Amino acid sequence: MTGVPSNIGMRTLRWLLAVSFLVGACTQGTPSAPPTAPPATSVGTPGGTPVPAAAVLADGSPLPSGCSGPSLPSQTVAFVSGGRAWALDPTTETLSCLFPVRDPGPFAWGPQGDRVLLGGFRVRGLNADAPDLPGIAAQPATFDWGHPIGLAVVFADAAGEPEKRFMDDGRVERLTALPAGTYLHVAYHPSGLALAFVVDQDGEEAIWFSTNEGTDATRLVFGQGGTRFTSIAFSPDGQRLWWVAEHAGGYPVLHWMDLGHRSSFTDVWRGSDGTFAQDLQLAPAGSLKSVNTGTVCDQREALIIEGGSATPAMPFEDRPTAALGWLDRSHLLVEAGGCARPTQLYSVDAGGGQPVALVTGAQLASPRTVLRNAPDTVPAPNSAAGQPPLGGLG
């Protein structure tokens, strides 16, 4: 797979940015590790299995014993602890208990922060306009919420078959118009009118684009020589499709394609040889992105990408880190620790500054960021020349 070359060589760009970073670091004094909140402890069962205790807040205070809301839009950090779901404002530290939960599953919030996907494909809503749906037998291996409201979830089950569950009545429909294959990743266009998929067909992966009903499917990009696509995402304005390709040579590359001109794509960032990147996430506005690198838990590292440069989200953190998602255009929710150790949640300012400790010992966490100013159209190729070649780009 090839792409449009950048104006500055990738090695040159990384070198220049590295020098700039070092110069800035020298003028700002000796760096220090981020603050650490008091640890959450564990208690043992009769069989000796540790049971996580309730999480503690950054100031060391325990979570409240009651469970009352309502949640606020500013409470963009959601987490699970002590059998309950919580929402926290990362700036004011205002906390709300949302609801009891036994199986949080993916704990993935819809684009308006008013509904969440739980274990067993149950859906829990936070207000009268949001759905409460029981679980179903399907176990989504990959999924994405419908946009801009969250009226459906498109997913692929364990067998890789593409399906859609509707929030009005809970029904599930197969997207039979899509090409055959094993569906590995899915992304909903922010307008809600289109879908993108990574599909494996006989061991070869490709990126497909379709309407929100799975019709008019077009192959945009296909992998060559064993290239795998580990993540896909649309830009917040809906103009571009982004993806991470793990090349057979053993390095990741971040690419984008202009949906109005689908005859080419651009290489943005190349990871080091022998590395693996996934979990691509785009900030809700602006140009920032994040990925997670590493193939095993204790090697995880969250990276922030701007332009062609990637830097660690928490460069002075010794524990494994993982980007969980963007809280706003410049703040990233990052988890440090894990791997059989207590986790700690931080709000990381991509512009610099000390990471802000939020919670220690949460069982699970995710952003609850509200989608705003969503587009209402999908870019169409601006001419015949803007269409992808028959079969896609390789």
Residue spans for each PLM region:
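Sequence signature of WD/YWTD-type beta-propeller architectures
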Residues: Q28-G394
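Sec-dependent signal peptide recognition
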Residues: R11-A18
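Enrichment for repetitive, rod-forming helical segments
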Residues: A18-F21, P131
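N-terminal secretory signal peptides that target proteins for export/translocation
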Residues: M1-M10
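C-terminal motif of bacterial Sec signal peptides marking the signal peptidase cleavage site
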Residues: V23-A25
